């Protein structure tokens, strides 16, 4: 049965979401490779998995459908065309050489689809291939080198694709460590029975090509509703990527305006949702740095000729108020004194997942910010995050809404 896929806001009733439980990819993280793979530290994968199960069950207890990326990928591999496409794109002749690549693809094609999905996200080392596969490429590599690097950032399903009103952007990622993630999502959205033939728009990123500087990540995209989309211009999401997405949204009449805000280019502000999330009709959780009056902000609208009209805004808050038709945005800033606020922002106090207006999921460790939410009438459903939080992503980062009501 074809499911409905539509995301009309950040705060309407959440109905269906895609998550990725920690698996082999995080077990491949070591102190020597974690920074290359965009992590600050190694995690206890078993404990992270337990915490993730609590997160998923919290959503299920609220009546929200939870789909797991590994399950979707495994089921997608049941489609012969999808399996062939994924093996061709993820095991490249140009990376491994035509003979070795063919041998590896042939061997992978014979394993169970669950095991193949595990390797497509968790990576593959030279030590794992059969001894019968012999090649100069094998002879010149250490057994612990990667044939296919792991994708530990699949944990953050928010970034690789984002649903915006009646369509999806399958995002070209900025960092090499994440670019192969997008191919797994391309395959799921093309061939999985849940999505294949669905009446939704693919705005951007569905082609497996070099997007150069036109990169986009879902953590920077907030569907604030009423025909508006708010996008952070970060170290991962570029003006070029924003323009491509905005033009597609306007072409398909799915948005009336796109608000673009420039973010500080440092690790703690990696994406807009690490410093700002929409949690109630007129209420945003923010780390104050992003709403300073001197932050650059523009509103993009259609120019009537297929291009974009750009309007400089006086402040981000004013742009949001105009878009939502409200008199004043209410802000809940990160809690505690200056030291506590910086610590809690680093631990994703602002990166909460709104389930419905005024109800969010967030890490229990952020006690000062959670107390401010409570005093403001926002209900926090707390989840543990001592290990998950070390990946530098909270409940919003770890979730990709597939169906959410508008406002």
UniProtKB/Swiss-Prot annotation:
Active site: 397
One Pfam family it belongs to: ADI
GO biological process: arginine catabolic process to ornithine; arginine deiminase pathway
Cellular component annotations (GO), alphabetically ordered: cytoplasm
Top-rank taxon, per record: Bacteria
Pathway(s) it belongs to: Amino-acid degradation; L-arginine degradation via ADI pathway; carbamoyl phosphate from L-arginine: step 1/2
E.C. number(s) listed in UniProt: 3.5.3.6
Catalytic activity: L-arginine + H2O = L-citrulline + NH4(+)
Stored InterPro entries: Arg_deiminase (IPR003876)
GO MF term set: arginine deiminase activity
Subcellular location: Cytoplasm
Main subcellular location: cytoplasm
Enzyme class: hydrolase
UniProt KW keywords: Arginine metabolism, Cytoplasm, Hydrolase
Similarity comment: Belongs to the arginine deiminase family.
Matches recorded under PANTHER family: ARGININE DEIMINASE
Protein name as annotated: Arginine deiminase
Gene source species: Escherichia coli O6:H1 (strain CFT073 / ATCC 700928 / UPEC)
